[in-house]
Regions:
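Short amphipathic alpha-helical segments
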Residues: 6-10, 35-36, 97-100, 126
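A short, aliphatic-rich alpha-helical micro-motif
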Residues: 78-80
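Phosphate/oxyanion-binding active-site loops and adjacent basic polyanion-contact surfaces
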Residues: 1-3, 41-49, 180-184
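Glycine-rich adenosine-cofactor-binding loop
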Residues: 1-30
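Conserved SAM/SAH-binding loop
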Residues: 69-75
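Hydrophobic/aromatic anchor residues within beta-strands of the central parallel beta-sheet
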Residues: 65-67, 112
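E1/E1-like adenylate-forming module used to activate ubiquitin-like modifiers
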Residues: 83-191
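Glycine-rich phosphate-binding loop and adjoining beta1-alpha1-beta2 segment
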Residues: 20-61
């Protein structure tokens, strides 16, 4: 989701006119990502944030784009300096940590937009939190080991991972690129 979302935000003006579009990711682009990621083979084995920033600087040279290659959890204070924080990682532990920081620093912390896919891309969701009088991410999933209060999918939806024997990545989530692009579009609209 993140690569498509970064592109759409840039095309919408994020990082222009004195603004900055910072991208953070601790993962590298792998072969199993190519079917559902903005970036292609020339960016394999590169940090996703750095590669995406380089790609966007080529496509949209007027933007100010920065990259953080590594876990944002090592430098969460950088989030406090943003106008909007967007978590499109799909990493629930990171989402909970960002939410906890945001709630603890209300009302001065920027709004946080959480975006993700459920059920092998069957549903996309986007939720923005920031107002102290309204729900936070944990309000939607009070039992962190359980199911969310408001499910996007029916309870009998089966989640599967498959073996991707064609490349070095042992597991992949089988959903098409259109799902990541749709989730990014939803998040861009909410942002």
């Amino acid at each position: 989701i993140g690569g498509f979302l970064a592109q759409q935000l840039g095309q919408s003006g994020a990082g222009a006119g004195g603004g900055k579009l910072p991208l953070a990711d601790n993962d590298t682009l792998k072969g199993a990502n190519l079917g559902r990621h903005l970036l292609g083979a020339p960016y394999l084995d590169r940090n996703k944030a750095e590669a995406c920033a380089d790609f966007l600087k080529e496509q949209l040279p007027h933007l100010e784009i920065a990259s953080i290659a590594g876990s944002i959890q090592a430098n969460m204070e950088v989030l406090s300096r943003q106008d909007l924080v967007i978590d499109a990682t799909g990493d629930e532990a990171l989402s909970i940590a960002i939410n906890e920081l945001a709630v603890g620093k209300r009302p001065t912390f920027p709004p946080v937009l959480f975006s993700g896919l459920e059920g092998n891309g069957a549903a996309a969701g986007a939720f923005i939190a920031g107002d102290a009088d309204l729900a936070c991410l944990k309000c939607l999933k009070t039992d962190l080991a359980g199911i969310p209060r408001f499910r996007l999918l029916k309870g009998d939806t089966e989640l599967k991972t498959g073996r991707n024997l064609a490349c070095g990545d042992a597991h992949f989530i089988p959903f098409p690129v259109s799902r990541a692009a749709a989730a990014a579009s939803l998040a861009c609209d909410v942002a």
